[in-house]
Structure formats: C-alpha cells, structure tokens
Amino acid sequence: MKLDIKGILLLAAIAVALAFFWLAPSDGLQAAPKAKMTTIDGEPIDLTELRGKPYMVVFWATDCPGCVKEIPHLRSLYNDLGKQGFRIIAVAMPHDEIPLIKTMREEKAMNYDIVFDEDGTLAKAFGGVKVTPTSFLISPEGKIALQKMGELDMDQVTQMLRDML
C-alpha cells in the first residue's frame, strides 16, 4: 500500500486545528482555580479573594536548582510591586518537608507567602503540576495570563505586571 503523504499531512493539520479549537477556552484565558490554602505560618489564603490585583503562584521545591535560582528575582519582583498589591504565593511540592522549607526561607530571605502542598491538592488544581518551577501569573480578573514550566523570563513578567497594575 502506497502512503499518500499529502493526505496524511492534511489529516494531521485538520486534527491539530480541531484539537486547538476544542481545547481552547472561549475567551482565550482560562480562569485560575478557586483554591484555598494556608501558609507555613498559618495564614489562610483564598485565591478568589485576591481578585482585583495580579498575583503569581509558583510551584517550587527546595531541591530544585532552577527554583532556587529564581528566588532572588521573585524577592526583587515582590519588593518592587508588592506595595501596589501584587502578591507571590510559592507552593512547595509534596515531597518537600516543612523544616527544609523554613530553613530555605530564612537563608534566601523569601519575603512572600509560602504554602506547603502536602497532599498535592494545589498541584492538581493547577492542572497536575509535576515539574518545578512551574509558574502561573494571574490577572486582576482572575484569569491565567501566563503559565510557564521552567525558569521565568523576569523581563516579560515584570512588563506584564506593570501593564496590569
């Protein structure tokens, strides 16, 4: 049987186009999960109450080199924009341990909210996060404006935030 390459390519292109339109949210941006969590200091956070200002949720781990490399940049971003209402929530993955998380917070002067996702509920709520760092920038309207697996482009994030604030 002879393969018709043009036919296969056409079918593949149609399948990709259909999958894109079927999976894409209707307004182009997916709503952020309506999750509740508690910081490692016992402060409750309800993401639905953060509407009106942008915030970032960063899934990280103490044993993740890329995550540790991002900490000074996140700290600087929070220092620059926190007074305008911007918030960072760093979510430590289930394999981490509270003592290690607290030690890193002190050593790296992490001045933003830190949550321990002990049972993986938050990772599931954000689409099954398994890789760190994975970051979500949420718009003031509660939509996911940026989702990034791997280290962030801080210039891009800063510009997006300045446009939102």
Where are the predicted features?
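N-terminal targeting signals for export/organelle localization
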Residues: M1-T38
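Short extracytoplasmic/periplasmic juxtamembrane "stem" segments immediately C-terminal to an N-terminal membrane anchor
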Residues: P33-R51
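Short active-site neighborhood of thiol/selenol oxidoreductases, capturing the structured segment around
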Residues: L47-P65, L74
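Structural microenvironment flanking redox-active thiols in thiol-disulfide oxidoreductases
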Residues: V68-K108, E118-K124
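Thiol/disulfide oxidoreductase modules built on the thioredoxin-like
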Residues: E106-N111, E118-D163
